[in-house]
C-alpha cells in the first residue's frame, strides 16, 4: 500500500470512528451499535484532528498521479469545509435538530438498509436507541439558547414529532418480523428508553431554548465566501452567483411563457401546470408507471450512446417502506452504500393511502403527474443520481467512493434533465413545461441562498420569492426555506453545478471539434466520482 493510500485509510478510519452513523452510511459496519459523541471536549478534539489532516493533505509530497492529486485536493476541500462548519459556524451550538437528526438517521439506516440479517441489525438498533439519551444530554450542554434562531426552533419541533412517530410506528414494524422473543422485548425496551429521552429533551427545549431563541441564521458573507472557496473550490463571489441566478431566472421565464403559449395561448404557465397535474396514472398503477419510465430512460441512454451504464448495475422500483411515507410523499432515491456488497439502488414510490382523506389522496395523485414523472426519473435514476453514484461507488479511489461534492452531484442531476430533452427523450412540450418550471425554482434557490446568508434577506422574503416566482405552495416554500437557513451553499449548488458542466462541455467540444464524443465526455465526467467541479475541469483538460 502506498503512502498516499495509507493516509486516506487513516483519515477514513478516524472519521468513521468519530461518526459511526457516517460509517454505517458508507457501508462500514464496525460501529453499527454506536452513535457519535458530541460532548464539548470531543468536538474540540474532532476539530484538532481535522486540522491535523488538513495539514497532512496540504503538505503531502509523495509521488502522486494526476488522479491521486485531484483526490488529495478533493479530500482537503471536504476537510476544510468540515472545519468551517465545526469551528467557525458552530452548528452544534445553535441547531437543535443536528442532534435529533444524528440519532434518527443512525437508527433509520439500520432499519432501511438490508446489509445484514435482521436480528443483527436490531441488536445494533437497540444499542443506538439507548444512546439517544447521551447524545441529547450533550445537546443540552452545547446549545446556547440565545444563539438558536427562531426558525431552527420550528425545525426542531417538527423533527421531534417525526422522531416520536419513528419510535412509535417504524421500529415496532421492524421488530414484528423478529422471531426471537427476548430480542424483540429488548428492542422495545430500548424504544421506550429513547422515547423517554426525547420527552425529557423536549421539556428542556421548551423551557430553556424556546423563550430565549433569538439567534441569526445568516452565516454572513465572509463565511459564505469561505465555504465557496475552501469546500467547493469556487472563485466566483456571491454577487456573481446571484447575478447568474437572476439571468437564468429571466431567460427561463421567457421560455416558459413561449412553451405555455404553444400548449394553450389562453393560460399563464403556472395555471397550465396546475391543470396538467390532473393527468396522473391510476392509483393502482403508480409504482408500475415509475418502473416503466425507469426502464425506458435506461434503455434510451444505452441505445443513444449517451453514457456507459456499468455492468451489473441495478435499480429496483419499490413501494416506499411504511416508515418512510410521512417524509416521502411522492418518490425518493436510496443509493447503495459504497462499501456494501449489495450495489442495488432503490427507487421509492409512495402509494396512495386509501385511509387518508379524499382531498389528501387527490393531492398526492396530482403529485405523480405524468408530465412531471419523466423528469423525476431522469433526475433521480437515469442518467441522474443513481447512475452517477453507482459509477462513483465502483471507483478504485476510496476518496471518490465516499466524498461527493454537492455542486457536482446535484449539478449532474439537473444537467441530465436538460440533456435528455436535447437528446430527444421526449418531444412533449408539456414535459418541457414541468422541466422549465423546476429550473425557475433552481434559479430562485441561488438568489435566495445568497440573499438569506449574505444580503439580510428575511425568512418571509425568501418564502415570497419561492411563492411568487417559482409558484411553490406556501407550506412547501416554508419547508424549503427552513432547510436553506441551515444549509448555506447547498441550494445554489444545483444550478451552479449544471452551468459549470455545460460550460465544460462547450470547452471540450470546441477543443476536440469533430472528434468530440458525448458518450466519452460523460464517461470521463462520471469517472471523476463527485469531485468538486473545478477539479473535474482540470481532469478533463
Residues covered by each model-derived region:
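N-terminal maturation segment of proteins
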Residues: 1-541
Amino acid at each position: 500500500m502506498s503512502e498516499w493510500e495509507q493516509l486516506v485509510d487513516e483519515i477514513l478510519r478516524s472519521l468513521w470512528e468519530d461518526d459511526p452513523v457516517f460509517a454505517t452510511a458508507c457501508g462500514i459496519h464496525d460501529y453499527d451499535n454506536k452513535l457519535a459523541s458530541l460532548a464539548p471536549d470531543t468536538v474540540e478534539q474532532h476539530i484538532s484532528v481535522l486540522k491535523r489532516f488538513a495539514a497532512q493533505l496540504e503538505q503531502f509530497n509523495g509521488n502522486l498521479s494526476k488522479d491521486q492529486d485531484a483526490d488529495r485536493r478533493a479530500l482537503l476541500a471536504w476537510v476544510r469545509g468540515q472545519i468551517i462548519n465545526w469551528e467557525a459556524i458552530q452548528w452544534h451550538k445553535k441547531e437543535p435538530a443536528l442532534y435529533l437528526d444524528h440519532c434518527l438517521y443512525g437508527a433509520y439506516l439500520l432499519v432501511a438498509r438490508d446489509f445484514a440479517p435482521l436480528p443483527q441489525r436490531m441488536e445494533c438498533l437497540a444499542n443506538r436507541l439507548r444512546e439517544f439519551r447521551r447524545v441529547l444530554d450533550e445537546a443540552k450542554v452545547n446549545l446556547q439558547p440565545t444563539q438558536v434562531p427562531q426558525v431552527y426552533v420550528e425545525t426542531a419541533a417538527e423533527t421531534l414529532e417525526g422522531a416520536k412517530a419513528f419510535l412509535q410506528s417504524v421500529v415496532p414494524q421492524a421488530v414484528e418480523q423478529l422471531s426471537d422473543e427476548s430480542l424483540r422485548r429488548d428492542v422495545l425496551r430500548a424504544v421506550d428508553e429513547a422515547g423517554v429521552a426525547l420527552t425529557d429533551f423536549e421539556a428542556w427545549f421548551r423551557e430553556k431554548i424556546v423563550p430565549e431563541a433569538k439567534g441569526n441564521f445568516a452565516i454572513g458573507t465572509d463565511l459564505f465566501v469561505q465555504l465557496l472557496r475552501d469546500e467547493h473550490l469556487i472563485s466566483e463571489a456571491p454577487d456573481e452567483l446571484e447575478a447568474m441566478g437572476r439571468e437564468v431566472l429571466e431567460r427561463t421565464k421567457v421560455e416558459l411563457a413561449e412553451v405555455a403559449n404553444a400548449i394553450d395561448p389562453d393560460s399563464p404557465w403556472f395555471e397550465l401546470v396546475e391543470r396538467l397535474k390532473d393527468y396522473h396514472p391510476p392509483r393502482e398503477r403508480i409504482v408500475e408507471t415509475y418502473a416503466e419510465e425507469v426502464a425506458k430512460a435506461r434503455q434510451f441512454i444505452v441505445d443513444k450512446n449517451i453514457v456507459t451504464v456499468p455492468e451489473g448495475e441495478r435499480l429496483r422500483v419499490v413501494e416506499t417502506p411504511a416508515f418512510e411515507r410521512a417524509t416521502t410523499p411522492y418518490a425518493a432515491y436510496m443509493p447503495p452504500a459504497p462499501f456494501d456488497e449489495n450495489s442495488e439502488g432503490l427507487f421509492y414510490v409512495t402509494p396512495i393511502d386509501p385511509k387518508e382523506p379524499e382531498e389528501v389522496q387527490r393531492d398526492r395523485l396530482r403529485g405523480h403527474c405524468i408530465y412531471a414523472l419523466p423528469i423525476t426519473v431522469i433526475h433521480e435514476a437515469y442518467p441522474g443520481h443513481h447512475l452517477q453514484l453507482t459509477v462513483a461507488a465502483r471507483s478504485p479511489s476510496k476518496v471518490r467512493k465516499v466524498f461527493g461534492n454537492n455542486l457536482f452531484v446535484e449539478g449532474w442531476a439537473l444537467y441530465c434533465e436538460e440533456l435528455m430533452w436535447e437528446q430527444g427523450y421526449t418531444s412533449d412540450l408539456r414535459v418541457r413545461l414541468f422541466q422549465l418550471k423546476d429550473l425557475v425554482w433552481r434559479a430562485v434557490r441561488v438568489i435566495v441562498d445568497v440573499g438569506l446568508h449574505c444580503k439580510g434577506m428575511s425568512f418571509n422574503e425568501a418564502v415570497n420569492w419561492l411563492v411568487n416566482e417559482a409558484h411553490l405552495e406556501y407550506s412547501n416554500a416554508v419547508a424549503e426555506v427552513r432547510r436553506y437557513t441551515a444549509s448555506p451553499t447547498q441550494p445554489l449548488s444545483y444550478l451552479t453545478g449544471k452551468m459549470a458542466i455545460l460550460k465544460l462541455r462547450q470547452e471540450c467540444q470546441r477543443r476536440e471539434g469533430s472528434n468530440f464524443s458525448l458518450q466519452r465526455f460523460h464517461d470521463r465526467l462520471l469517472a471523476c466520482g463527485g469531485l468538486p467541479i473545478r477539479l473535474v475541469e482540470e481532469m478533463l483538460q
